[in-house]
Amino acid sequence: TKNVPNSTQKTALPETLRVLMDRPGQMHQNGQYLLLGSASPRVMHKSESLLGRAVTLEVSGFDIGETGTDAHTVQQLWLRGGFPAAYLAPDDAVSTQWRTAAIQRHVSSDLPLLGMNAPAPLMTRFWQMLAHYHGQTWNAAEPARSLGITEPTVRRYLDYLTQTFMVRQLQPWHANLAKRQVKAPKIYFRDTGLLHALLGIRSLPQLLVHPLSGASWEGFALEQVLRIAQPDEAYFWATHQGAELDLLLFKDGRRVGVEFKRSDAPKLTPSMRIAMEDLQLDALYVVYPGQHRYALAQQVEAVPLTALLP
């Protein structure tokens, strides 16, 4: 196996590898290449060049299974995020400095290399605005008005951040119901450390009292659940009448709902009952940052985030 430099900066590498792989006499040899990159092959327009020759594996930052499950460790991962340099920094100030620099590097260097030609100050403002959408349904009209650009341009900016693994657009599930259901995706920063840097949150005390603390923890827990569960499909569900489900997972023929509550003792809510009935869930887990696992109703259970590890 041969290591290859970061493909985001080396845009000709996929074509080069294709030539190497297709050389006469190479067909039955075991040559393998590890192609690293910080963007989806789709956004690099290179997916066809290695079609049938490559397997794409998404590698995320640290998760609770790697850092540990004691309360202090989990809170540090939530605050600083999973990038190794940010998580392992000697203190919160150094971690914040690294994350702030990483954001500027992504805006000024990585995105332009991928064809994102927006001015860096404009893209930075967009990213800062997007931080306030974390955990909310997306509405392109508002940031478009604020930035003085068109809605298609705003959507293109969002798609670039999605394809570079900075943002997750969680798509809505549309059940066969006689109810008006939300059709726009929900926006989550995949790394809460970057989210906190954009929001100016530099320490755990600041995070715990911030107005977006609950939404931040929801996004953090959601990413952990997706890594642990490895579902076949994942969505959220919401109606215009107010019923909603944070996460709907499909795996091995089962339909499982997940709610996230940053509280010491979550309780069953009317929205959970509606989701159980309307979506015909096999189970519903209410994930929270506590220590005890307990039943809330039939097929509904409160589960500590750290208890989800196999």
Whereabouts are the PLM-identified features?
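Conserved ATPase-coupling elements of RecA-like P-loop NTPase cores
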Residues: 5-17, 45-47
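Active-site-adjacent loop/helix micro-motif of nuclease/hydrolase catalytic cores
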Residues: 12, 264-273
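Conserved catalytic/switch belt of AAA+ P-loop NTPases
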Residues: 14-35
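Interdomain motor-coupling "hinge/lid" segment immediately C-terminal to the ATP-binding subdomain
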Residues: 30-31, 37-141, 166
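Short, polar loop motifs at secondary-structure junctions
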Residues: 38-42, 286-293
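Domain-level recognition of nuclease-like catalytic cores that cleave nucleotide substrates
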Residues: 61, 291-310
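Accessory nucleic acid-recognition modules appended to NTPase machines
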Residues: 92-252
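Active-site ExK catalytic segment of metal-dependent nucleases
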Residues: 255-264
